[in-house]
Amino acid sequence: MKWVTFISLLFLFSSAYSRGVFRRDTHKSEVAHRFKDLGEEHFKGLVLVAFSQYLQQCPFEEHVKLVNEVTEFAKTCVADESAENCDKSLHTLFGDKLCTVATLRETYGEMADCCAKQEPERNECFLQHKDDNPNLPPLVRPEVDVMCTAFHDNEATFLKKYLYEVARRHPYFYAPELLFFAARYKAAFAECCQAADKAACLLPKLDELRDEGKASSAKQRLKCASLQKFGDRAFKAWAVARLSQKFPKAEFAEVSKLVTDLTKVHTECCHGDLLECADDRADLAKYMCENQDSISSKLKECCDKPLLEKSHCLAEVENDEMPADLPSLAADYVESKDVCKNYAEAKDVFLGMFLYEYARRHPDYSVMLLLRLAKAYEATLEKCCAAADPHECYAKVFDEFQPLVEEPQNLVKQNCELFEQLGEYKFQNALLVRYTKKVPQVSTPTLVEVSRNLGKVGAKCCKLPEAKRMPCAEDYLSVVLNRLCVLHEKTPVSEKVTKCCTESLVNRRPCFSALELDEAYVPKAFNAETFTFHADMCTLSEKEKQVKKQTALVELVKHKPKATKEQLKGVMDNFAAFVEKCCKADDKEACFAEEGPKFVAASQAALA
């Protein structure tokens, strides 16, 4: 790369990077400005989500009351921006409103102390008290007729309840995306409550929304963790890699601009600034649709959709085709004598360009692998640019990438083979045993949840063509392992987990993969109560039965971490036979009472 070209790119990049597409005038009243931009419906929805994500235990009616008060106040400010308190920041207005909740101290304990602080400390304090695993009852789906009646009787309240229930269980759910889910939820009821067979129409749609919603929440949680724990440089690096894969025809300056704006949007949402986030996301969608020619040929059908669908579609858009004539990277990043000069002049820009060039050529790599390669390249330049002969020192840098590329390739290959051989349930069990041996201190419910989700990678990714398997699998595993990190941070029990979670975002998955059996762990004493079952086991759904069995499996491994595969398989086969036998018996409870102790004794003997 010619030095002049690099300097001009640096100028372009830094101006684009600092500017982005958002040009915000200062407004007399921020709340009036957002109300006008978003419209009443979206404004109310976002305020409800914000309050539900902060105060996760408050009853629905309390939140609706707060939202109505904020909305009426916003309308006052729209009518007269200089009215009293209209000039206050949104954090001040929202924080003041949260602090009026009478039961704050008794419901949330020390969170009430946040109210003694001033902004911005007060908002930071509220954010720190968001609970990723709130003690809320599982959502039970009513009968279809009951839901349809509620939908017809009061559609607005029905949809608000959906926003409230999802937001309080997922305090980092991407708010504008949750409005999109609510719109789909509404459309499903509007269509299916008219259908001849309401249940056949509605239930698959609700299942799909639930599964997509959980996945969306987990993906956003990783983005927020990345920003909160590793700073915006880590998030920007992730975004450069991902957008360069999606938009390989876009110039580096264009990708940089999009990255800056995406970082702003996600920083706002992760920080609880949901009105600004939704407004800026709409602006970003508008910008992308006005500049399709310089971004991607795949945006057209997204841009014809209404706002919420458009933003969702743009976020999920498939990768554009790679330009046919991309030159080899070696010329600019290995063979050039100017590498150290360019690197020293503007390290982050040079590394950003390297990441952009590498990612647009490799849609077949996971984002996390691309970031590891950029990190390895950076480490090599740090070392070599201080050496006597820098060029000689970094000449083989691309060869050093090979083991980094092969590690996830082999991991995906081995695990997909295991998945094909075992099927999903038994593949989950294999992962349960693997992870319980690695980190036996982690709570059983967390190990079951995380291993079940890790096991879903098979069905999600292993059927894909080779070129799509690694990005699908490794980036999905990063999302699931982030859930483990988030839960573990709340109640830390394992130094190994803390180390893998906090040392490096891009190396989390390899760190967990490399963990061995924890030799220092003192096995858990055998507790017959854990393996005592009753007739209610027979009425459980298939999924609930699996969770019960998997819970028992984790407890077995915690009791005997060095048990062989054969020993564990023998016990689990006996368990399945015992449950099947008693569920077929005339007096189920009597069977469980009689056969249960025999199963426990046989299990202990098998594992002795």
From Swiss-Prot:
Localisation: Secreted
Positions bearing Phosphoserine: 29, 82, 89, 297, 443, 513
CC per GO annotation: blood microparticle; cytoplasm
Protein name as it appears in the record: Albumin
Record-listed N6-methyllysine modification sites: 558
Prosegment location in residue numbers: 19-24
Chain residues that bind Zn(2+): 91, 271, 273
Family designation: Belongs to the ALB/AFP/VDB family.
Binding site for Cu cation: 27
Phosphothreonine: residues carrying this PTM: 107, 444, 446
Albumin domain mapped to chain residues: 19-210, 211-403, 404-601
Record keywords, A-Z: Calcium, Cleavage on pair of basic residues, Copper, Disulfide bond, Lipid-binding, Metal-binding, Methylation, Phosphoprotein, Repeat, Secreted, Signal, Zinc
Residues the entry annotates as binding Ca(2+) 1: 30, 268, 273, 276
Residues that bind Ca(2+) 2: 37, 279, 283
A single MF term (Gene Ontology): enterobactin binding
PANTHER family xrefs: ALBUMIN (PTHR11385:SF15), SERUM ALBUMIN-RELATED (PTHR11385)
PTM note: Phosphorylated by FAM20C in the extracellular medium.
Top-level taxon in the UniProt lineage: Eukaryota
Pfam families according to UniProt: Serum_albumin (PF00273)
Tissue-wise expression: Plasma.
Assembly notes: Interacts with FCGRT; this interaction regulates ALB homeostasis. Interacts with TASOR. In plasma, occurs in a covalently-linked complex with chromophore-bound alpha-1-microglobulin; this interaction does not prevent fatty acid binding to ALB.
Organism: Macaca fascicularis
Residues that bind (4Z,15Z)-bilirubin IXalpha: 264
Function: Binds water, Ca(2+), Na(+), K(+), fatty acids, hormones, bilirubin and drugs. Its main function is the regulation of the colloidal osmotic pressure of blood. Major zinc transporter in plasma, typically binds about 80% of all plasma zinc. Major calcium and magnesium transporter in plasma, binds approximately 45% of circulating calcium and magnesium in plasma. Potentially has more than two calcium-binding sites and might additionally bind calcium in a non-specific manner.
Record keyword Mitochondrion present: no
